[in-house]
Regions:
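Charged phosphate-binding loop/patch that engages nucleotide di/tri-phosphates or the phosphate backbone
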Residues: 191-217
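N-terminal glycine-rich anion-binding loops that anchor highly charged ligand groups
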Residues: 50
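Divalent metal-dependent catalytic cores for phosphoryl transfer on phosphate-bearing substrates
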Residues: 34-41, 59-184
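Short, Lys/Arg-enriched N-terminal segments with co-localized hydrophobic residues
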Residues: 8-28
Length: 217
């Protein structure tokens, strides 16, 4: 299937759609030029390219599944703005914004970057709650995810710079059914975490269970 951002999501659309998506990605109305520059200045190297990739993938998923592309794209460029911070800096932001880390997050503070990024999006960029909520759960997932939550989680997993076993399958599923794609992502993530002997966040288990209860396959 490959990783052409302009064709892996929207079946039957011309590859030139990539240029249109890139044009839209640079003109998200919720995020004016000055704000966009401020956000992107916090991202470096791979994280910069990754966030732009998530923005584009989120816009495409939003257009495919009927969510607001502006909200999806904005969530995409904001989702990792605290990813570069050290574990102690993550915990400091938690203290500042009243975030109470769970036991798993205390052991793996990098998991907090979704919640701390959401806090920054809310406090510094005055983003609406649905965008902040999507950013907050983009790493772990959660029970009863909204469409915007699902789009950001999936866009983060399948964006064009991602290259790991299973990503092409996730991209294929994203063309067919967003819930099936999400369930596949959860399954892959849980399998990897178990294989590596890593802690599993309760929200990830809840997200997986929610899909199963709904009969997603």
């Amino acid at each position: 299937l490959g990783t052409d951002c302009g064709s892996f999501l929207l079946v039957g659309k011309p590859v030139v759609l990539r240029q249109e998506i890139q044009r839209k990605a640079g003109k998200v109305m919720l995020c004016n030029e000055e704000m966009r520059k401020s956000i992107l200045s916090r991202l470096q190297g791979y994280r910069y390219e990754h966030s732009l990739g998530v923005e584009r993938a989120a816009i495409m998923l939003a257009e495919k599944y009927g969510e607001d592309p502006e909200k999806a794209g904005t969530a995409g460029i904001l989702h990792d703005i605290t990813k570069y911070l050290s574990p102690q800096e993550q915990l400091n932001l938690c203290g500042k914004y009243g975030i109470i880390p769970c036991t798993v997050e205390k052991s793996e503070p990098k998991m907090l970057h979704g919640k701390t990024a959401a806090a920054i999006a809310r406090a510094e960029y005055h983003m609406p709650e649905d965008i902040c909520d999507a950013i907050a759960c983009h790493t772990t997932g959660k029970n009863h995810m909204t469409l915007l939550d699902k789009i950001l989680y999936l866009a983060d997993y399948i964006e064009e710079t991602r290259d790991f076993p299973g990503v092409d399958k996730a991209r294929e599923l994203a063309q067919i059914d967003i819930d099936s794609a999400l369930l596949y992502c959860y399954d892959q993530t849980l399998t990897e975490l178990v294989a590596r002997g890593k802690l599993i966040h309760s929200d990830t288990i809840a997200a997986y269970n929610d899909m199963i209860r709904q009969g997603v396959s």
